[in-house]
Swiss-Prot record:
GO terms for biological process: fructose 1,6-bisphosphate metabolic process; fructose 6-phosphate metabolic process; fructose metabolic process; gluconeogenesis; sucrose biosynthetic process. This is Fructose-1,6-bisphosphatase class 1. It comes from Burkholderia multivorans (strain ATCC 17616 / 249). The gene is fbp. GO terms for molecular function: fructose 1,6-bisphosphate 1-phosphatase activity; magnesium ion binding. One of its GO terms (cellular component) is cytosol.
Length: 337
């Protein structure tokens, strides 16, 4: 692909704005700012030990998880990049207990940005792919946001995406009109369109789950995974392979490219906590992307994007990916009720 004929993220968004007329200028600018912040995060991730950013920060986030230095740095990069542009009313992050209103000395816009600044951060120190996940909502209260403003079901998202910081740095985006992937050209500093209208195969022979928790699973998940593990001689009549990176962005990106099902179920260890992944800035944006690519995403009993949030850091079980497999494991949950 010659440099002259490449489609950059900026060009793609401008063309989408012109052709479909469903991408407001403020939303286009917001997406570009988020993508620019992801470039800065990618740069800091790639420096590794040379950047003195590895290891823990000696603090915990609101979930009680030990924060890595890069967790905090990535969060600050996203806040600093987005607070002054006039596109947002407020932001919320995995790393902050409450939402972040745009300071009074900056203009405010009509959108809300929710993000996990560095997903899979347990992999930072061992050089495994990690990433950033984000979701964009309209602020129902105009430009004056409250925590309640964020508590919208995923069906209200106007954009969602993620970046993967791996062998290549990629930026995957949906604005409700398909899913497209952009690769960072480090020589010129641009996001370049490399995959258009991504589609997840409806059937798959791969699944992603943390099998070390098998003894804690509820019966529907155990039944489903046991059938997969039984292979060609089992009820499915086929051999399946398990893949688990322990980085949601990396696992979902693989599924987006070649199919599969990603599962992070609730289990018996914490019956009062329905799952581990956060609805607002992990499950919802990934569900939006997966559905736009022809896949499905449920909690096991309900479409993820139809869950009514009750808090910024609410957790849900997650089953997403190839449509036929997600529908099968969801059916097993309904049968057990």
């Amino acid at each position: 692909m010659s440099i002259a004929r490449r489609t950059t993220l900026s060009k793609f968004l401008i063309e989408q704005q012109r052709e479909t007329n469903n991408l407001p200028a403020d939303l286009r600018l917001l997406i570009e700012v988020v993508a620019r912040a992801c470039k800065a995060i990618s740069y800091n991730v790639s420096k590794g030990a040379l950047g003195d950013a590895l290891g823990t920060a000696g603090s915990e986030n609101v979930q009680g998880e030990v924060q890595k230095k890069l967790d905090i740095l990535s969060n600050e990069i996203l806040l600093d990049a987005n607070e002054w542009g006039g596109n947002l009313a407020a932001m919320a992050s995995e790393e902050m207990e409450t939402f972040f209103p745009i300071p009074a000395n900056y203009p405010r816009g009509e959108y809300l940005l929710v993000f996990d600044p560095l997903d899979g951060s347990s992999n930072i120190d061992v050089n495994v792919s990690i990433g950033t996940i984000f979701s964009v909502l309209r602020c129902p209260d105009g430009k004056q946001a409250t925590e309640e403003s964020f508590l919208q079901p995923g069906t209200q998202q106007v954009a969602a995406g993620y970046a993967v910081y791996g062998p290549q740095t990629v930026f995957v985006l949906t604005t409700g009109n398909g899913v497209n992937c952009f690769t960072l050209d480090r020589e010129v500093g641009s996001w370049v369109l490399t995959q258009s209208n991504m589609q997840i195969p409806a059937d798959t022979r791969e699944y992603a789950i943390n099998a070390s928790n098998a003894r804690h699973w509820y019966d529907p998940v155990k039944r489903y995974v046991d059938e997969l593990n039984a292979g060609k001689d089992g009820p499915r009549g086929d051999n399946f392979n398990m893949r688990w990176i322990a980085s949601m962005v990396a696992d979902v990106h693989r599924i987006l490219n070649r199919g599969g099902i990603f599962m992070y179920p609730a289990d018996k260890r914490t019956p009062d906590r329905p799952g581990k992944l956060r609805l607002m800035y992990e499950a919802n944006p990934m569900a939006f992307i997966v559905e736009q690519a022809g896949g499905a995403a449920t909690t096991g009993t309900q479409r993820i994007m139809e869950v009514q949030p009750t808090g910024l850091h609410q957790r849900v079980p997650v089953f997403l990916g190839s449509k036929n497999e997600v529908e099968r494991v969801t059916a097993y949950h309904h049968e057990s009720q």
